C-alpha cells in the first residue's frame, strides 16, 4: 500500500493542505511540505482527528434532525440479528433524557441492545432453558470475532452510545443503514502501534479495580457472562454493564461518567431464572448473580480475551501499563527534529544558534574540538566554513581569526585560551600554582644579589667591560670579536668594605640578536647601557633603551672609551636626554658614569652606582626554601655531556637530583656547574648555573620549574609538546580562501631556497633564522627554513636536505666524516659559518643568483639603403652604407621609414661585401643585406640592428 501524501489527504478531507500541515504539527508529526508522504497509521489518526472536530460542530444539529421512534416491545428481544452486528441507530429519546446519578439504580429498558456490542445468538431465549445454549453460542461468536477486534473497536468508536437511562431500540443489520451515527465524545481506545497514547487511562495504584470478595472469575472470553444460578444475591456493577436484554437487570453508570473511567464490576440481576448481563465492552465485567467477568481498564491498553479476573494475555503491541521506551525515543526524536527545524540554515546545513554564548578553546584547536563543545556534527562545520570561503578539514588546526569568523556566523563567541593561561591550567593539574607562590610571607624572604644586564651597540665595549670586572679575557674567544650568545656570570665586589655579589648577563649587540637582548631585559633587575663616547647613540643603543624601558628596568649609563681621541661624553648625555635618560647633573634620575673598560678607569664607581640603584629602587628579596623557579638563559648540545642549559634561578634553591621541566624538555639534574666549570650542589636565587641531565635542548627563554617527581615532569613536558605542536600547525596552516585561490596558485611558482640550520646553541639558531627570514631580494625568490636544531650535523639532516634540495648551514658545528661523505655523494651543499653576518651575506648572494635574468635591448648599428637589387633567387637585396656601429649576420633588425619602425623582429639572413659572404661589416663600409622573405624595402630606409643583452639583477 502506497503511503498517502498530504495534498491527497487534504482532498479526501475536503480541506486545504495548509490546514492538514497545521493539524499534523499539533499532533506532533512534523512534515516538510504538502508533497511529503506520511505513514498509514498517522493518516488514520489524522482522519480521526478531523472526524472528531466535525462531530463537535455537527452533533447538536444531527440530534435535532433525528426522527422519533417508538420504544421496542419486550418481544423484540427475541429477534435474531446477525451475531456481532452493531446497532445502527440510537434511541431518539437520548437527546432529551438526562444521565442518572452515579450509583443510583435505574430501570432496565427492555429489548435494548447497546450500540457496538454483539447481539445475542440467533436462537437466544430469555428463559433458563435456553440460557446454556445461548451462552455457548455467545462463546463461539466471541471466538469467531476475536481476530476482528481491531475492526470492531474502530467500528464501535465511530458509533454513538445512548445514556444508561434511555431506552434503546434494537435494529437489524438490514435496517436503515443510512441513519446518522453519533460520534464518540471521549478518547477512543485505539490500537495504533505508532501512537504514543492509545486513548485509554493507565491505572494507578489509587484506581486499580479490586474484585468483589464474593465474586469468582468466569470464563467469558471478554464477551459474555456465564449463566446465572438462582438463589444468589444481588450484584450491583460499576462502569461497563452487560448489555444483554433481561428483566430487572440493574447496573452502574456507563464508562466515562465517572472521573477515572474505572472498569466495570458486573451488571446485577435479581431473581431466579433471570439471565445475567453479558460482559461489558472489551472486558466489562458482567455476570449475573454476583458473577464477575474479566475486564480491562477503560483507559488503558485493551488486553486480549482471557479468563476473567485472572489477567489476560498481553496486547497486540506490548504489555499494558507504562510508556514504552520506543514512545520515549520517538518523543525525543521529534523534539530533536523540531529544534533542527528552528535552527538556521547555513550553507545547506542546520546548526543551532549559540545566541552569543562564550566558548573557550585551546590554541591550535580544530573543527572537531569545536563540534564536541557545541554538540554538532563535524561535517556541518566544515560545510559552513566552506560556505564562508575557507577550506579546512575537521581535524586541521585553525587560527584565532578563522574561529572568530566562524563564531560570528553560527552565533558563538569563540575565545582561544592564551598560551600563558593554558600553561597555568596545565600546571594546576599537578598542584603547581605559580600565582600563589608569588604571594610570599615577609618572614620567608631573604636578600638576593641583583641581576645586571650589559646592553648596547656592537663594538661599544660590553664584553670588554665584563672582562675587566671578572679579570678575564672572554672577548678573545669570541669569533669575529663580537658576542653571539648570552653569557651569565656572578662576581663579588666590595662596597664600603662589605662583599656583595652581582650577577651579570652579557647580551649580544649585533642587530641579529634582538630576541636575545629582549630576553636579557626581561630577566634583569638593573640594566647597564654601554655607549661609546666617540660613536654616540647608535641604532642598537636605541633598541636596548626600548627593551629596558618596556621591561621597566632602571638604567645606569656607562659612557665607555673616554680615553679614545675624539671622545665626547657630553654629546652622549645630550643625545640620551632625547630618549628620556636625563643625567642627575641635569636634574634627572639616571646615573651616568664615564669609564674606560680597556684602561680600567672608574669601573668601581660603575659597580657602586649599580648597587646603589638596586638598593634604592628595588626590593631584592626571594624565598630560598621553596622549589626552584627560574628562566633558561641559553642552551646548547654538548657532544660529551648532552643537553646543557644555562639557567638563572629566580626563586627557591635548585639541588642536584631535582626533577625539572624547562619548556618541552624535562629530566633530572645530574650535575650543576658554575661559569668557571666548577661543580655545585645547590644554586640559590639570582644564581646562574649550567644544568646537565635534560632529555632535549630547551629553547632560550623557557621558564623552568622543579616538579614533584620524574613522572610529573615527563607528563608536563609531553602535554606542552602537544599544545605547542597544535599551535604551530595552526600558525603555519595556509588558509586557502576561494577569493585568492588563483593568487596562492601563482605564489607556488616562486623559487624557494630551502635551508637547514644547525647551530651550537638555541639562541644562535634563533638569531640566524630571524636574520635570514628578513632578507628581501625580490618577489620572485624566497627563503624557507625546513628544519632547525641544536647540535652537530647528522645523517637525518643530510637526508632531509636531499629530498627537499636544501642547503645546510652549520653555525659553529661540523659533521662527522661519515655524514660529510654522505653529503658529498648526494650532492648536498654544506656551508660553515662562525660569524652571523657572513652567513647573511652569502645567503643574500645566493638568492640574487636564483633570480631569473633580465634582458635589455641594445642597438648595435644603423645602415642606410642606397640601392635595391632584385634577384629571382634571393628576392630584394638592399645595398646599404653602414653609418654607425657594426652589422653582423644573424642579428635582429627593424626597418625605419621616416623615423617610424614599420617592421620589427626581422633577421639579417645574408650579409655580403661585393661577392664575398662576410660575418660583419663595420662603420663606413658598403654591404649587401638580404632580409629573407621580406621584400618591402625602399630607398632611404634605415636598417637598425639590435641585440638583447642580460642585465645584472640588483
Swiss-Prot record:
Which residue stretches does the UniProt record annotate as biased composition, category Polar residues?
165-176
Q: Name one GO cellular component term.
A: cytosol
According to the record, the residues making up region (Disordered) are 47-338
Q: Where is this region: G4?
A: 560-563
Show the InterPro entries listed in the entry.
EF-G-like_DII, IF2_II, IF2_N, P-loop_NTPase, Small_GTP-bd, T_Tr_GTP-bd_dom, TF_IF2_bacterial-like, TIF_IF2
Stretches the record annotates as G1: 456-463
Q: Which CDD domains match?
A: IF2_eIF5B (cd01887), IF2_mtIF2_II (cd03702), mtIF2_IVc (cd03692)
Q: Which GO terms describe its molecular function?
A: GTP binding; GTPase activity; translation initiation factor activity
Subcellular location(s): the record lists: Cytoplasm
Q: Where is the signal peptide?
A: none
Q: Where is the composition biased (Gly residues)?
A: 222-254, 264-321
Residue span of region G3: 506-509
Pfam families given for it?
A: EF-G_D2, GTP_EFTU, IF-2, IF2_N
Q: Which PROSITE patterns match?
A: G_TR_2
Domain tr-type G: start-end pairs: 447-619
Region of interest called G2, as start-end residue ranges on this chain: 481-485
Bias kind Low complexity: ranges: 64-101
Q: What does this protein do?
A: One of the essential components for the initiation of protein synthesis. Protects formylmethionyl-tRNA from spontaneous hydrolysis and promotes its binding to the 30S ribosomal subunits. Also involved in the hydrolysis of GTP during the formation of the 70S ribosomal complex.
What is stated as this protein's family in its record?
A: Belongs to the TRAFAC class translation factor GTPase superfamily. Classic translation factor GTPase family. IF-2 subfamily.
Which PANTHER family does the record cross-reference, listed alphabetically?
TR-TYPE G DOMAIN-CONTAINING PROTEIN (PTHR43381:SF5), TRANSLATION INITIATION FACTOR IF-2-RELATED (PTHR43381)
* Protein name per the record: Translation initiation factor IF-2
Q: Which species is the source of this protein?
A: Bifidobacterium longum (strain NCC 2705)
Amino acid at each position: 500500500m502506497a503511503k498517502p501524501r498530504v495534498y491527497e489527504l487534504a482532498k479526501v478531507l475536503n480541506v486545504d493542505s495548509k490546514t492538514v500541515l497545521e493539524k499534523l504539527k499539533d499532533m506532533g508529526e512534523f512534515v516538510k511540505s504538502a508533497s511529503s508522504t506520511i505513514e498509514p497509521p498517522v493518516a488514520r489518526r489524522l482522519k480521526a482527528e478531523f472526524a472528531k472536530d466535525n462531530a463537535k460542530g455537527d452533533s447538536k444539529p444531527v440530534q435535532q434532525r433525528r426522527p422519533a421512534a417508538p420504544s421496542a416491545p419486550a418481544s423484540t428481544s427475541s429477534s435474531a440479528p446477525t451475531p456481532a452486528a452493531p446497532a445502527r441507530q440510537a434511541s431518539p429519546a437520548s437527546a432529551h433524557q438526562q444521565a442518572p446519578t452515579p450509583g443510583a439504580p435505574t430501570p432496565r429498558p427492555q429489548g435494548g441492545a447497546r450500540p457496538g456490542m454483539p447481539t445475542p445468538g440467533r436462537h437466544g431465549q430469555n428463559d433458563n432453558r435456553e440460557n446454556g445454549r445461548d451462552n455457548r453460542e455467545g462463546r463461539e461468536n466471541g471466538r469467531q470475532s476475536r481476530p476482528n477486534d481491531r475492526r470492531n473497536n474502530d467500528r464501535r468508536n465511530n458509533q454513538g452510545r445512548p445514556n444508561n437511562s434511555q431506552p434503546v431500540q434494537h435494529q437489524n443489520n438490514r435496517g436503515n443503514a443510512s441513519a446518522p451515527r453519533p460520534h464518540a465524545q471521549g478518547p477512543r481506545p485505539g490500537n495504533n502501534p505508532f501512537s504514543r497514547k492509545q486513548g485509554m487511562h493507565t491505572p494507578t495504584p489509587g484506581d486499580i479495580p479490586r474484585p468483589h470478595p464474593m465474586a469468582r472469575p468466569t470464563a467469558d472470553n471478554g464477551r459474555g457472562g456465564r449463566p446465572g444460578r438462582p438463589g444468589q444475591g444481588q450484584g450491583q456493577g460499576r462502569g461497563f454493564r452487560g448489555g444483554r436484554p433481561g428483566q430487572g437487570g440493574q447496573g452502574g453508570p456507563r464508562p466515562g461518567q465517572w472521573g477515572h473511567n474505572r472498569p466495570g464490576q458486573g451488571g446485577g440481576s435479581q431473581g431466579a431464572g433471570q439471565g445475567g448481563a453479558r460482559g461489558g465492552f472489551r472486558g466489562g465485567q458482567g455476570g449475573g448473580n454476583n458473577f464477575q467477568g474479566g475486564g480491562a481498564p477503560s483507559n488503558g491498553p485493551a488486553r486480549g480475551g482471557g479468563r476473567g479476573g485472572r489477567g489476560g494475555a498481553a496486547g497486540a503491541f506490548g504489555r499494558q501499563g507504562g510508556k514504552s521506551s520506543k514512545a520515549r525515543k520517538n518523543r525525543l526524536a521529534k523534539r530533536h527534529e523540531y529544534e533542527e527545524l528552528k535552527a538556521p540554515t547555513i550553507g545547506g546545513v542546520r546548526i543551532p544558534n549559540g545566541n552569543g554564548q562564550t566558548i573557550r578553546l585551546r590554541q591550535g584547536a580544530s573543527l572537531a574540538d569545536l563540534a564536541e563543545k557545541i554538540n554538532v556534527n563535524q561535517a556541518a562545520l566544515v560545510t559552513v566554513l566552506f560556505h564562508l570561503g575557507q577550506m579546512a578539514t575537521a581535524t586541521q588546526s585553525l587560527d584565532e581569526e578563522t574561529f572568530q569568523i566562524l563564531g560570528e556566523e553560527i552565533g558563538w563567541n569563540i575565545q582561544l585560551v592564551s598560551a600563558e593561561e593554558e600553561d597555568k591550567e596545565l600546571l594546576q593539574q599537578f598542584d603547581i600554582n605559580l600565582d600563589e607562590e608569588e604571594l610570599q610571607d615577609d618572614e620567608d624572604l631573604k636578600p638576593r644579589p641583583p641581576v645586571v644586564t650589559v646592553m648596547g651597540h656592537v663594538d661599544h665595549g660590553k664584553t670588554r667591560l665584563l672582562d675587566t670586572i671578572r679579570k678575564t679575557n672572554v672577548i678573545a674567544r669570541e669569533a669575529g670579536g663580537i658576542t653571539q650568545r648570552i653569557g651569565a656570570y656572578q662576581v663579588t665586589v666590595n662596597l664600603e668594605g662589605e662583599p656583595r655579589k652581582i650577577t651579570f648577563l652579557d647580551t649580544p649587540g649585533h642587530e641579529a640578536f634582538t630576541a636575545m637582548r629582549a630576553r636579557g631585559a626581561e630577566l634583569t633587575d638593573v640594566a647597564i647601557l654601554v655607549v661609546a663616547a666617540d660613536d654616540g647613540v647608535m641604532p642598537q643603543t636605541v633598541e636596548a633603551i626600548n627593551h629596558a624601558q618596556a621591561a621597566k628596568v632602571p638604567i645606569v649609563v656607562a659612557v665607555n672609551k673616554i680615553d679614545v681621541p675624539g671622545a665626547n661624553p657630553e654629546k652622549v648625555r645630550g643625545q640620551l636626554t632625547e630618549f628620556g635618560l636625563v643625567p642627575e647633573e641635569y636634574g634627572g634620575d639616571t646615573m651616568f658614569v664615564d669609564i674606560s673598560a680597556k684602561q680600567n678607569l672608574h669601573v668601581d664607581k660603575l659597580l657602586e652606582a649599580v648597587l646603589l640603584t638596586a638598593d634604592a629602587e628595588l626590593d631584592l628579596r626571594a624565598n630560598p626554601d621553596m622549589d626552584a623557579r627560574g628562566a633558561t638563559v641559553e642552551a646548547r648540545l654538548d657532544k660529551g655531556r648532552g643537553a646543557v642549559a644555562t639557567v638563572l634561578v629566580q626563586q627557591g634553591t635548585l639541588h642536584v637530583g631535582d626533577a625539572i621541566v624547562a619548556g618541552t624538555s624535562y629530566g633530572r639534574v645530574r650535575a650543576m656547574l658554575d661559569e668557571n666549570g666548577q661543580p655545585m650542589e645547590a644554586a640559590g636565587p639570582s644564581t646562574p648555573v649550567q644544568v646537565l641531565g635534560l632529555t632535549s635542548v630547551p629553547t632560550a627563554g623557557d621558564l623552568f620549574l622543579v616538579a614533584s617527581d620524574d613522572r610529573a615532569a615527563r607528563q608536563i613536558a609531553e602535554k606542552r609538546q602537544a599544545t605547542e605542536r597544535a599551535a604551530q600547525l595552526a600558525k603555519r596552516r595556509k588558509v586557502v580562501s576561494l577569493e585568492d585561490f588563483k593568487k596562492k596558485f601563482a605564489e607556488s611558482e616562486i623559487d624557494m631556497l630551502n635551508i637547514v640550520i644547525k647551530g651550537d646553541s638555541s639562541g644562535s639558531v634563533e638569531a640566524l633564522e630571524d636574520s635570514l627570514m628578513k632578507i628581501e631580494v625580490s618577489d620572485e625568490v624566497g627563503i624557507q627554513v625546513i628544519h632547525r636544531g641544536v647540535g652537530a650535523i647528522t645523517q637525518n639532516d643530510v637526508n632531509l636536505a636531499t629530498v627537499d634540495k636544501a642547503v645546510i648551514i652549520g653555525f659553529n658545528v661540523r659533521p662527522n666524516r661519515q655524514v660529510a661523505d654522505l653529503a658529498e655523494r648526494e650532492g648536498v651543499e654544506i656551508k660553515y659559518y662562525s660569524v652571523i653576518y657572513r652567513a647573511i651575506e652569502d645567503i643574500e648572494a645566493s638568492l640574487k643568483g636564483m633570480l631569473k635574468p633580465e634582458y635589455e635591448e641594445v642597438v648595435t648599428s644603423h645602415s642606410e639603403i642606397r640601392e635595391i637589387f632584385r634577384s629571382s633567387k634571393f628576392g630584394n637585396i638592399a645595398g646599404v652604407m653602414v653609418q654607425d656601429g657594426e652589422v653582423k649576420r644573424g642579428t635582429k633588425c627593424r626597418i625605419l621609414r621616416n623615423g617610424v619602425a614599420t617592421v620589427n623582429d626581422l633577421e639579417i639572413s645574408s650579409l655580403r661585401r661585393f661577392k664575398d659572404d662576410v660575418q660583419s661589416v663595420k662603420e663606413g663600409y658598403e654591404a649587401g643585406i638580404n632580409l629573407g622573405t621580406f621584400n618591402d624595402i625602399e630607398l632611404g630606409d634605415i636598417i637598425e640592428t639590435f641585440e638583447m643583452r642580460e642585465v645584472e639583477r640588483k
